[in-house]
From Swiss-Prot:
Organism: Arabidopsis thaliana (Mouse-ear cress)
CDD domains: DnaJ (cd06257)
One GO term describing the cellular component: plastid
Modified residues (N-acetylmethionine): M1
Family annotation (InterPro entries): AtJ13, DnaJ-like_C11_C, DnaJ_domain, DnaJ_domain_CS, DNAJC11-like_beta-barrel, J_dom_sf
UniProt name for this protein: Chaperone protein dnaJ 13
Length: 538
């Protein structure tokens, strides 16, 4: 099962919906009903204690502000797109807009314009470096470095419809080297078609043009024609791509020229699996390749690659792991006609470092087996005895540092949540007693916060745990008269009245133990997941 290793970001601008426990698609009537429910509890005139009256006043103002924004069609649309920042900045939409559709269209136009401006303000660099190393050559004193290849490209948006990319390749071995410089100008002709002009100079000087058009909602066609400036040859390539399903696509490519070929390919990609394959017929023979990648956890994956053809036969096995937000490392083992290789890759953003290491040019079964088993065993040993303990220690250290930084903030939020729960207590108890009489839904225990801290609480470990807050009272308050409890998808639960964020920056869960028709049940949901109890069939 995949571990939760990072706090999900979730949809933006949902705090006011959480405050009133509303769905982002709530109707005007549902908004009014929720407002009345919360206002009856937190109205200051209903509170006798001076201390609690101050708490009630603060929460009542928050409820009124949420209702004022969500009940106003224009303000709600601005909030949904830009949040409180958009409202506080006094975003003007113009007096000519009166209908909801017009307002929404104008807001989306402004948002698109801002996104385009942001996109145009940034360059998009990509690059890769490949070092070819050879152990056999090193052992005979001939040096370990056998060659190097570098590729780099920078793309920039010139306007809404125009983009330019400038790049180059450089290759060198122990005796010779060379390079190619390339410039690409791309123009979006219409929403369904584009054209590119390509020019390169160096070892492969050429000029070319490529156009792409979306034929149907599921089909795309691309035609490319290029002329070599060195030998005058002309190459023509046609590619047809078809979306086969939501997660897979197929393509057929026909190339005419110096290297005429027909290629049929297939790709599939979903949340946990990525696969691709192609079959190629060319003048020099036949060839096929396949690649399968599976996500093993939220930060690691395994991969197998196979190639077979008239002059190729090899298989790759390996995997990779994300070591930071932007960096991934990968180790592959390759055995084939060219020999036995290890390949180490480092990916950071759009930059790649690839180091193939030739271990042996001969296919000795014992050596091939050892070359696979030794690094694999070493990896699992290091992972168990070095990497995991280190990562666990670092995770605890980060959690401790985060706790120290946010201690005061969390303490204040927890105090506000507990006072808000005190005001809910009377109504929550009354609702609970009503459910007891009808043998309905009764929340016996509800905890919100760090999943590990919740697990420790459930195992009977006592003591103050700052990673969790008890939310039994607000959960009983939110049980409807019909004996149902619903929290909406996409709404962060820390914004609900009587809740707070007990562990900022960490993933959170909501644990609920309840009885229904005198039968005990338990449920755990993520911070943005929907909760609906009792579940069907209970």
């Amino acid at each position: 099962m995949m571990g939760q290793e990072a706090a999900p970001t979730g949809p933006p601008n949902r705090e006011l919906y959480a405050l009133l426990n509303l769905s982002p698609e709530a109707s005007d009537e549902e908004i009014r009903k929720a407002y009345r429910q919360w206002a009856q509890v937190y109205h200051p005139d209903k509170i006798q204690s001076p201390q609690m009256k101050e708490v009630a006043t603060e929460n009542f103002q928050r409820i009124c502000e949420a209702y004022e924004i969500l009940s106003d069609e224009t303000k709600r649309l601005i909030y949904d797109l830009y949040g409180m920042e958009g409202l506080n900045s006094g975003l003007e939409l113009g007096p000519r807009l009166s209908k909801a559709d017009e307002i929404k269209e104008e807001l989306e136009r402004i948002k698109r314009r801002n996104e385009e401006a942001k996109k145009m303000a940034h360059f998009q660099p990509t690059g890769s470096i490949l070092f070819n190393l050879s152990v056999p050559h090193f052992l005979v004193g001939d040096g370990i470095m056998r060659g190097m290849v570098m590729a780099s490209q920078v793309q920039s948006q010139l306007s809404k419809d125009d983009a330019i990319a400038i790049g180059g390749n450089l290759a060198a071995n122990e005796k010779s080297g060379g390079g190619v410089a390339t410039a690409i100008l791309r123009r979006q002709i219409s929403p369904v078609s584009s054209i590119e002009f390509v020019a390169s100079t160096g070892l492969q000087s050429l000029i070319g043009v490529q156009t792409t058009r979306q034929l149907t909602i599921h089909s795309t066609a691309t035609i490319n024609i290029s002329k070599s400036l060195s030998d005058g040859s002309i190459n023509l390539t046609n590619t047809w791509t078809r979306q086969l399903s939501e997660t897979s696509s197929g393509n057929i490519e026909l190339a005419l020229g110096m290297r005429s070929a027909i290629t049929v390919g297939w790709k599939k990609r979903d949340e946990n699996v990525s696969a691709a394959g192609d079959f190629k017929i060319e003048s020099g023979g036949l060839g096929a390749s396949a690649r399968y990648t599976r996500k093993l956890s939220s930060k690691s994956h395994g991969r197998i690659v196979g190639r077979i053809g008239s002059n190729a036969l090899e298989i790759e096995l390996g995997g990779g792991r994300q070591i930071s937000e932007f960096s991934t490392v990968r180790m592959m083992y390759t055995v084939g006609l060219k020999g036995i290789f290890w390949k180490v890759e480092l990916h950071r953003g759009s930059q790649k470092l690839i180091v193939p290491i030739l271990l042996s040019a001969h296919l000795a079964p014992v050596f091939a087996t050892g070359a696979f088993i030794v690094p694999t065993s070493l990896y699992f040993l290091l992972k168990k005895f070095v990497v995991k303990p280190y990562l666990l220690k670092r995770e605890k250290q980060k959690a401790l540092e985060n706790m120290e930084k946010t201690w005061g903030q969390v303490g204040e939020a927890r105090a506000r949540a507990e006072k808000a729960q005190q005001l809910l207590q009377t109504v929550a108890t009354r609702k609970k007693n009503r459910q007891v009489e009808t043998d309905g839904l009764i929340v016996t225990k509800a905890l919100y916060g760090d999943p590990k801290a919740i697990e420790r609480r459930n195992e009977g470990v006592e003591g103050l745990d700052s990673g969790v807050i008890d939310v039994t009272v607000p959960m009983n308050f939110l049980v409807s008269d019909s004996g149902q409890l619903k929290l909406h998808e996409g709404v962060k639960k820390s914004g609900i009245m009587g809740f707070c964020d007990p562990c900022p920056g960490q993933p959170k869960q909501l644990y609920i133990a309840y009885t229904y028709h005198s039968q005990p049940f338990e449920v755990i949901v993520g911070d943005y997941e929907e909760l609906s109890i009792p579940q069907e069939g209970q």
